[in-house]
């Protein structure tokens, strides 16, 4: 049954999608250029997928979009303003390897809601709703770090949703998961976007990208090589790096 997000989005009904833009962004480390004059825009599509070979800068781009790191050159804006504390809180980030407290599942969610200054009387109901969304009602009092990989990832996603984001960034959320766990994550992504939260997803899985993406941003060597609707990307990619990647020829 679809989850009712009204408890976390009651004050957001009039809020437009939060556009995020990277303009001439560069990042270097140890004399090596990781992101090179990157220009991209995350707009109104419900689900954007970032693809590209290893080392293309996909995970780094997610961190730039969320403000977890600052660029060496260029500008990151959200809602037309430079990324700062006030608009960063509208952008959630879930890492490939979940970072969970050494406490119970319930306590992890309680901690996230406390950070949003949610009153104790409201936290109880919200925790139950988040547990239901994640399918973890039966594991509420279990140690979070004792969950399976798929369960930990679902917990991380709903914990991020507790912060009422407009945009949720997911860094390879199904990497190393079995097909059943992958399906559960994809259902959760469906529910999240159905509720009006935009999802930006990094994946190497072309099948998953076909299932989930409205649009694809293809990165190559720290630059944006292609930004097209998903159907166009998979049927008739424009750039040579994208064509080579889909044909299995592009490794680096």
Label each PLM-derived region with a short phrase.
Residues 143-147, 151:
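Conserved ABC ATPase signature
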Residues 121-139:
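Conserved ABC ATPase "signature" region
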Residues 179-181:
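Helix N-cap at the start of a conserved alpha-helix in ABC-type nucleotide-binding domains
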Residues 168-171:
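Catalytic Walker B motif of ABC-type/P-loop ATPase nucleotide-binding domains
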């Amino acid at each position: 049954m679809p989850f009712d997000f009204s408890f976390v989005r009651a004050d957001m009904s009039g809020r437009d999608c939060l556009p995020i833009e990277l303009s001439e962004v560069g990042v270097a480390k140890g004399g090596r250029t990781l992101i090179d004059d990157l220009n991209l825009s995350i707009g109104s599509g419900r689900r954007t997928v970032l693809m590209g070979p290893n080392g293309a800068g996909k995970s780094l781009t997610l961190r730039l979009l969320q403000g977890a790191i600052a660029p060496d050159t260029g500008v990151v804006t959200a809602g037309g303003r430079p990324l700062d504390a006030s608009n960063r809180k509208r952008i959630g980030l879930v890492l490939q390897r979940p970072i969970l407290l050494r406490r119970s599942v319930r306590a992890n969610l309680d901690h996230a809601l406390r950070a949003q200054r949610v009153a104790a009387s409201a936290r109880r109901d919200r925790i139950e709703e988040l547990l239901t969304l994640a399918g973890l009602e039966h594991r509420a009092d279990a140690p979070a770090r004792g969950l399976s990989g798929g369960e930990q990832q679902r917990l991380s996603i709903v914990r991020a949703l507790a912060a009422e984001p407009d945009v949720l960034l997911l860094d390879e959320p199904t990497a190393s998961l079995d097909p059943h766990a992958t399906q559960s994550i994809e259902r959760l992504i469906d529910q999240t976007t159905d509720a009006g939260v935009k999802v930006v997803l990094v994946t190497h899985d072309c099948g998953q990208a076909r299932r989930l993406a409205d649009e694809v941003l293809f990165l190559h060597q720290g630059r944006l090589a292609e930004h097209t609707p998903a159907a166009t990307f998979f049927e008739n990619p424009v750039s040579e790096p994208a064509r080579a990647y889909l044909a299995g020829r592009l490794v680096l």
